[in-house]
């Protein structure tokens, strides 16, 4: 199937053609190796492929969350707040890329 690319739309793309799951701080291929096409309403064509996760992937994510919960629970509220503020700063620095992704995904 022909893919819609930002290049086809005259825009330089900061995005990958395929996205895996983000589990335990790293990108992980779906256990069954399956992906689905993310269709953009702009053209009705696939924009990228995204991991088609299932219960096995969810179990891996839950295991990672359970592993991280103890350390997070021991983190002071001040340090947690600083981490969340850093996340907000990174999102703000990448607002154009995020809004472009939302536009492509939603068609407006």
For the regions a language model picked out, list residue spans one by one:
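Glycine-rich loop-to-alpha-helix module at the N-terminal edge of alpha/beta enzyme cores
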Residues: 46-108
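Terminal low-complexity tails and localization/encapsulation signals of metabolic enzymes
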Residues: 1-49, 82
């Amino acid at each position: 199937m022909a893919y819609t690319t930002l290049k086809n739309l005259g825009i330089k793309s900061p995005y990958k053609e395929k996205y895996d799951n983000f589990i335990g701080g790293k990108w992980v291929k779906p256990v069954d190796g399956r992906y689905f096409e993310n269709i953009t309403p702009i053209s009705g064509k696939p924009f990228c492929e995204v991991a088609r996760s299932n219960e096995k992937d969810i179990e891996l994510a839950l295991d990672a969350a359970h592993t991280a919960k103890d350390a997070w629970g021991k983190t002071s509220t001040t340090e947690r707040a600083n981490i969340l503020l850093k996340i907000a700063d990174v999102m703000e620095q990448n607002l154009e890329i995020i809004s472009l992704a939302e536009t492509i995904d939603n068609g407006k």
